[in-house]
């Protein structure tokens, strides 16, 4: 059973020249240790929702699995903070001698295989999807309106996958990588093809987020914030359309603008 993603806690607030007691919503940090074939693989600090999706998406992002059929079983014991995964294969030497890792909620830079492993897994997009400006603006508006817990706490990252019209899945997490891993896990579980889908994301498009989008396989990533220079370089190299600063009825296209058409047809 999923735990609460946020909890009300007593605080002291200062406002209008006065101190007073009240309550506020805190986001929950939940450590989940992932065991693969009986061996400790990593501990992820996350929000305690959609944990099976998170585990599957995380393992796929790390290159431990490539498809749903490689999973024999996934058992979540959230009372003890463990995910027990059995694969229909061995992990192989690349993972056998790796050190135990703590993946913090704030970022992904503690990942042992950052860039070396990522380069082998990230996919060059062959997406044929096209979007109109109004589709882009409407998708970001919908993401923000769906993020009620962020509005209460200000502490969660939000992400969704869409075909430009319909949201297939929307997920939230304290960690930006976790939110995307949950989307990835959802799609793997249901054999959803994401080549011609769009990733909508509440945070900045960093190089790590761009690589994550490439691993998932989408052709377009939308964000209300700006990308980094390395993210734009990677987006151009991986044939991904990166759109940022989606706000107040406008946006910037940073790479592969051919997928954005100035027409409502």
Swiss-Prot record:
Cellular location(s):
Cytoplasm
Q: Which UniProt keywords apply?
A: Cytoplasm, Molybdenum cofactor biosynthesis
* Keyword Membrane among record annotations: no
Query: What is the first-listed, main subcellular location in coarse terms?
Result: cytoplasm
> Gene Ontology terms, cellular component aspect?
cytoplasm
The protein's matches in SUPFAM superfamilies, at most eight in alphabetical order, are given as:
Cytidine deaminase-like
What are its GO biological-process terms? Mo-molybdopterin cofactor biosynthetic process
InterPro entries per UniProt: Cytidine_deaminase-like, FdhD
Q: Listed disulfide bonds for this chain?
A: none
Cite the GO molecular-function annotations of the record: sulfur carrier activity; sulfurtransferase activity
Transmembrane region positions? Answer: none
Q: Which residues form the active site?
A: 107 (cysteine persulfide intermediate)
Q: Belongs to which family?
A: Belongs to the FdhD family.
This molecule's function is given as: Required for formate dehydrogenase (FDH) activity. Acts as a sulfur carrier protein that transfers sulfur from IscS to the molybdenum cofactor prior to its insertion into FDH.
Q: What is this protein called?
A: Sulfur carrier protein FdhD
**What species was this sequence derived from?**
Staphylococcus aureus (strain NCTC 8325 / PS 47)
């Amino acid at each position: 059973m999923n735990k609460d993603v946020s909890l009300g806690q007593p605080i002291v607030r200062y406002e209008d020249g006065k101190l007073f007691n009240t309550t506020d919503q805190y986001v929950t940090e939940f450590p989940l240790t992932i065991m693969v074939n009986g061996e400790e693989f990593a501990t992820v600090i996350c929000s305690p929702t959609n944990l099976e999706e998170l585990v599957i998406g995380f393992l796929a992002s790390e290159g431990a699995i490539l498809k749903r059929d490689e999973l024999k079983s996934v058992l979540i014991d959230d009372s003890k903070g463990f995910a027990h995964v059995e694969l229909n294969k061995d992990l192989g030497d690349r993972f056998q001698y790796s050190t135990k890792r703590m993946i913090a909620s704030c970022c992904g830079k503690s990942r042992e295989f950052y860039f070396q492993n990522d380069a082998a897994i990230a996919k060059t997009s062959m997406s044929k999807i096209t979007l109109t400006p109004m589709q882009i603006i409407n998708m970001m508006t919908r993401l923000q309106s769906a993020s009620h817990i962020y509005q209460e706490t200000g502490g969660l990252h939000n992400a969704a996958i869409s075909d430009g019209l319909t949201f297939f899945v929307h997920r939230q997490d304290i960690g930006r990588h976790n939110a995307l891993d949950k989307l990835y896990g959802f799609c793997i579980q249901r054999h959803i093809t994401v080549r011609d889908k769009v990733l909508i994301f509440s945070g900045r498009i960093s190089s790590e987020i761009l690589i994550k989008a490439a691993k998932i396989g989408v052709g377009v990533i939308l964000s209300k914030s700006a990308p980094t220079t390395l993210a734009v370089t990677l987006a151009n190299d991986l044939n991904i359309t990166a759109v940022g600063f989606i706000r107040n009825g406008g946006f910037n296209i940073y790479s592969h603008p051919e997928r954005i058409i100035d027409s409502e047809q």
